[in-house]
Design a protein with these regions (language model features):
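Conserved phosphate-binding/catalytic loops in two-lobed NTP-binding clefts
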Residues: 103-129, 133, 137
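Phosphate/ATP-binding catalytic cores across multiple sugar-kinase/actin-like superfamilies
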Residues: 57-85, 130-133
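Structured core elements
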Residues: 33, 90, 114-115
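Acidic, glycine/GT-rich loop-and beta-edge segments that sit at the periphery of enzyme/chaperone cores
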Residues: 9, 13, 28, 129, ...
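Residue-level signature of catalytic and energy-coupling elements of molecular machines
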Residues: 16, 69, 91, 127
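Short beta-alpha connecting loops at secondary-structure transitions
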Residues: 1, 111-115, 142, 149-152
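Phosphate-binding glycine-rich/basic clefts of nucleotide- and phosphate-handling proteins
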Residues: 1-59
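Glycine-rich phosphate-binding loops at beta-strand->alpha-helix junctions
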Residues: 21, 25, 81-105
Length: 153
């Protein structure tokens, strides 16, 4: 929108993200033609977009996610961090399917990363499973935000 003064629909944006989106440089820059509406004239417009442009757009949110992964590791017990280092990190959710997310996190954490077999469904299934155990969880079992606040305060 900002770079090309062009408006595209959510479906088109999702298609571009899935097709050529990346957070780590691809071996070859991918290009996709996008159709939308010119914000200056209101007329239809076509524009070629590259994976390098998308990587630049995703840089800040990707960095924030990696920083959160590092923060969780820092706040976790040594035993848990050792288990994660031994077994690796499994990425879930739609965003992890962006090209290179596993490489980026692995590079920053120095821990091997893999993408779950069905990353889109894993988050929902995991939430459902956690509800089955909610009554048996102890207070603070997964309260990392509280630990972070205590550490900063």
């Amino acid at each position: 929108r900002k770079r090309y003064a062009m408006l595209i629909g959510l479906g088109t944006a999702e298609e571009v993200k899935i097709t050529i989106g990346c957070v780590y440089e691809r071996p070859e820059d991918a290009v996709m033609t996008v159709k939308g509406r010119d914000l200056k004239t209101g007329l239809p417009k076509e524009q070629s977009v590259t994976s390098l442009e998308l990587m630049e757009a995703f840089k800040r949110p990707a960095r924030q996610i990696v920083d959160e992964v590092l923060a969780v590791l820092e706040l976790s017990s040594p035993e848990l961090v050792a288990d994660v280092a031994r077994n690796g990190i499994v990425l879930t959710g739609g965003g992890c399917q962006l090209y290179g997310f596993d490489f980026l996190i692995s590079e920053r954490t120095e821990i091997p990363c893999t993408i779950a077999d069905d990353p889109d469904s894993c988050v929902a299934l995991g939430c459902g499973k956690s509800l089955e155990w909610i009554n048996s969880m102890q207070e603070g079992t997964i309260n990392l935000a509280r630990r972070r606040l205590m550490k900063e305060g």
